[in-house]
Amino acid sequence: IHPETGLPIAPERFGWTSVFAREIARIARADPTVVGITAAMTRPVGLGRFADEFPDRVIDVGIAEQHAMTMAAGLARAGMRPVLALYSTFMNRGFDQLIMDVALHREPVTVVLDRAGITGDDGASHNGVWDLSIAAMVPGLRTAAPRDGEELAALLREALAHDGPALLRYPKGALPEPIPALSSHSWGDVLFSGERPEVAVVAVGSMVPVALEAAGRSDVPVRVLDPRWALPVADGLVDELMSGYRGVVTVEDGLVDGGVGSEIALALARAGYTGGQAHIGVRREFLDHRTRASALAREGMTADDVLSGISAAGRADGPALLRPRGARSA
């Protein structure tokens, strides 16, 4: 792990963007209905290889995310399978079109968001922390967050096979080592399980390694769950969380207010869950310009913070919403 970025150290060819670039080109060779769309960022978002091989099937609309989203909806209506690739922070510009042109009509558009979550020294405006909260409020939109390169490739194919809109998000930087599942279910994967686990940790995408580190150090027996398709929250995941855990912890690289943690808390409330809860993610505030590692520490999103959440949720005697606090002065 790089001490400044908080990301795995690996050559660029093993980065998230490179995996997407290889996989979308491979898919495009086999399916002529797949087209790529981007907003003045063909190579930064990983569509360069696709464009080199099929220049008439990759469209760069310029700095016009609203137009890109509407064009994707139109191409989908015409029978194509558009893949709209953006930086996460720039999807905000196409929010209205995502709702009214794509989701309202259930068009099979796949939105791929690079640099999702805390990006660190790209600058305050480039932190992609809004997408999960945005996606959570859009009816019919499925949202996936891969934990490693193999999952990125698999989820991209699942998104393109879906008969409605789908969103795929992943962070900037290098990939972790492959993270195998202990078992797979309709709602996602079990990645770690202590003996007679008392606390369930739901880890989203790039936060899976952080959750696994905390689980390995925890004195409280823990089970780590990866929902894969994080939104909407699957009924099967709620059933799993209602199956006897004393506490539930969620960890996501995005706004915790309105994001996956909030959606899980609401689902558990509706189901009558009475255990403790801790929801870890970015606060509802603008992040300043700092390294990713520093931002994670400031926001209370490190393995130590997850450990604190496990401890607090596991010992709660009744329904309680708990959130570990980071070092705000860092």
Residues covered by each model-derived region:
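Thiamine diphosphate
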Residues: 2-52, 60, 66-69, 104-127, ...
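Extended, hydrophobic alpha-helical segments in both membrane/secreted and soluble proteins
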Residues: 46, 58, 65-85, 94-98, ...
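Phosphate/diphosphate-binding loops
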Residues: 80-170
